[in-house]
Amino acid sequence: MSGLRISDPSKLHLKKELTHIRKVASKGLRDPGTTSSWKSPLTSSRFVVEPPASNNVEILSNNQLDSQFPSSRVFGNNGKEKEKKVFLYNWKTQRTSSEKTEGEDETSWIQASLNDDDDDDDDVSDARNGGDSCLEETRSASMIRKSGFIKKKSKELDLSIGRKSTAKARNFPSHHLHVASGLSVVRDESDETEDFSNSENFPTKVSSPLLLKLKRKNWSRSSSKFLRGTSKREDSSHTCNSTPALSTSSYNMYGIRNPSTVGSWEDGDDELDDDNLDFKGRQGCGIPFYWTKRNLKHRGGCRSCCSPSFSDTLRRKGSSILCGSQSVYRRHRHSSGRFNKQKLALRSAKGVLPLLKYGGDSRGGSSIGIGYSDDDLSTDFGEIDLEAQSRLDGRRWSSCCKSQDGEREEEEEGGSTPESIQSLSQKYKPMFFDELIGQSIVVQSLMNAVKKGRVAHVYLFQGPRGTGKTSTARILSAALNCDVVTEEMKPCGYCKECSDYMLGKSRDLLELDAGKKNGAEKVRYLLKKLLTLAPQSSQRYKVFVIDECHLLPSRTWLSLLKFLENPLQKFVFVCITTDLDNVPRTIQSRCQKYIFNKVRDGDIVVRLRKIASDENLDVESQALDLIALNADGSLRDAETMLEQLSLMGKRITVDLVNELVGVVSDDKLLELLELALSSDTAETVKKARELLDLGADPILMMSQLASLIMDIIAGAYKALDEKYSEAFLDRRNLTEADLERLKHALKLLSEAEKQLRVSTDRSTWFIATLLQLGSMPSPGTTHTGSSRRQSSRATEESISREVIAYKQRSGLQCSNTASPTSIRKSGNLVREVKLSSSSSEVLESDTSMASHDDTTASTMTLTCRNSEKLNDIWIKCVDRCHSKTLKQLLYAHGKLLSISEVEGILVAYIAFGEGEIKARAERFVSSITNSIEMVLRRNVEVRIILLSETELLNSKQTRQIAVTTSSYTESGNEIPMKRIEAIIQEQRLETEWLQKTPGSQGRLKPERNQILPQEDTNGVKVLKICEMGEFQENQSGKRMEHCPVSPSLLHNSNFTNNKDNLGYESESGRGVCSLLFCWNTQKSPRRTKIKGTSMRSRRSRERRFSLFSACARPRK
């Protein structure tokens, strides 16, 4: 080897041939060590260039290479001379038709480069270093022909490089640079060679001669000399590295290259004066020439291993590495440094770390025969990594071309295998029909359709998000193309098509999203292509899934409608939508529609419990229930919440779920509701502000309160806290009044929520709504079941309250002989309610009255003996009346006889003694009925009857005696009798004057809800004073002063005849009237017969003024 010189003229004729080979290799090959995504192509079988008809090749050694280059011809086994053809193989899977077209273009481009003889010697690339890789069959080790002069050759070459100059660099014989790696030339072989097959799969086990030689030789020592020789001449145009000439300048899918490493292939020698990494045709290992000896000495004894091409991938793979090639894309001259920086940052973010980033991952202790471990190498190569990372660009091989062993490649690079997926919703997504949850009807229908072959051309899946619509469409696609011929459930999961589906590589499924950019245009383009296709018979189904189809424009729907009119066989469309209203009716009527309902909370909890068990998550059972409740029927949302909670790194509890979702716990809501209903204003405001300060949403809290109240009313709520178990929240302990309060609160919350959504200050109005819950009407004033009830209560004056209180203390009793004369029922069975003290229930307890069956009685007799309940009911009914005039009328003349129940309706019988009073009371039946219903809280029918005069007077006398007796026995704290009589007198005179005076009702403002008489009367109809005794005697027998008598009674003949019985007596002893304020305008014919009497003389004798006295009538 010492005889060979660079300037040897006998070797100059090989330079041009080698230049073309270098250019081809540099354009087609790529250094596997400069990209972290490179993998050992042990099972790869895809070619960059289409191979010839014969796939058999023969590996030539370096000696054969030197002998073959002068003639530029190669010979096959048959001894015939053939044209030299150099093919560059990329060990990947078979390519598609479009890729094959590119491969043919690349083949013609490569052949054109080989036949180009016009290029001069200025085109120099870094393939001088043995850029052509060798292919070797591992089954036959004898095929590798060792050359014994490699070591000598490398030594002599190192010395020659040190003495060469820049001018002589261009004349250096290129074939001397290939001794370190060996160049293999592939040529055609016959089909009978046993070492290689004609199938698509290339040999599965191959090894690089470079690595074999590195194992057999002391590579580190020889290569270190190359590095030392390189560092002596930094301005040299040649680089003598120990690695093959592979590219550090890679191509991305768009052909854009880094301007620092990429340039025109036709540039000349003017580039040789720059840094070798900045050569526009540079394809070196990545180490710049400005690396000094000092930098190399820092690496110690392994300075020869500084080439970035020997990355961690090389050291792990060992001798099973083959250099691949990448498709040459169209080159662009325009690019920017900022673009490359962004691309580099993007690759770093994705985990694409070039060179020796993973050098610390040692697998055995030493690296390629060097006496240093991987950890030492990773430390030494740190500076190289930084330099190479800033200069390398390109695209990961796994994204450019896929191999047949793609699933293993994705597993190594963190692909889409279940073990590497982080999202629980994707990891546990349904893959078969039986894994779909909550959609039993849809699953059964689709399974039967696949089994019977009755598949529709268009399906429409409608339902909320997260219910399994897209997963069902994918499973349907796999089931249609499953190769299982038995009656097993499809998809089976183990045939080839099902395997591709489970790996996400199904060729028969196309998913389009109308919500994405240009999604609608893609759907329209697809339909346009399908409409132009001729009908053809196919064995496989093509399934097109259109997600968010309600976003498609009208013209796309028209295209789909045309497809439905003339559908193609084996083509199925699955339209998925969450808004069925925006899908045209014509489309809905022409497709099979499946409704995906919300998943039940119980099914969600079962699924979450299984996931938590598989993932070893510590979750409370109540927390899973709360997650399912807040998921709102979406299984995907529930799985997402569970994943978020699992990232907290602690036990998943109910409080943690509430904090994540942003809702208030039920315990706090119960406490707030109880405070609001109890009318505790201060505590309600304080508690509400505490919850709002924690970040709770007022609208959400209002919805929670409404849901809580509905659960309590329905009896479906179970209090978790013991202190609420016996409270009013328990449905069994709720009274009718409590239910009414809850219903009223629910109504207020529903109305306030509508106003709260449009309010700007939601917190304030939320608290105001809570305060309204405590101001609800009491159960006694709750109106139930009558269209005639009134909504407001009139204010009560002191006179009414005092009289009622006095009557309640006096213990009035009805007469023992009081009974209705006749109560007739035609054809109805009457059930009488006897309200005696022994047989009636307390009506104040808001319960219905007990009834007794009496199927034989057509009339009823009420014994009023000791009937305190009847009196209490009647007093309460009178108190409920809004008109003071009506109150006085009922209290003075009315009497509650009985309450009967006829066919479920209560009938109250009210008796009056006079026909005129009865007629007047009948005009106020609605008000009387309303007041009685408010007391009894039942629908009541009021019937007014007329009692005989004798019975009424006897009842009055009995009541008067009772009042007189009780007034003396209960002296002390009782109200004075005279004061009560004076107040009643003033009130009745005022009422009578208002009713009689013309226009007084128009001038005076009536009371609230006062019911005035509807008819005008000429005579004055005043109330009788039946409660107070007219004659009261003390123990000495003296008669008390007489009470004033109503003028209407004085003009009543019946009253005059029975005056003695009633206890009325004229003050003067004469039956004359003072005519002052007397409404008896008619002159009596008897007045002319009165003699010797005058008003003045009478007044003078009586020495006092009497407003009302007996009218001037002759005494009998």
UniProtKB/Swiss-Prot annotation:
Keyword Amino-acid biosynthesis: no
Residues involved in Zn(2+) binding: 482, 492, 495, 498
Residue spans of biased composition, Polar residues class: 778-793
Sequence positions that bind ATP: 463-470
Protein's name in the database: Protein STICHEL-like 1
Organism: Arabidopsis thaliana (Mouse-ear cress)
PANTHER family given in the database record: PROTEIN STICHEL-LIKE 1 (PTHR11669:SF67), REPLICATION FACTOR C / DNA POLYMERASE III GAMMA-TAU SUBUNIT (PTHR11669)
Coiled coil segments of this chain: 726-760
Domain of life from the UniProt record: Eukaryota
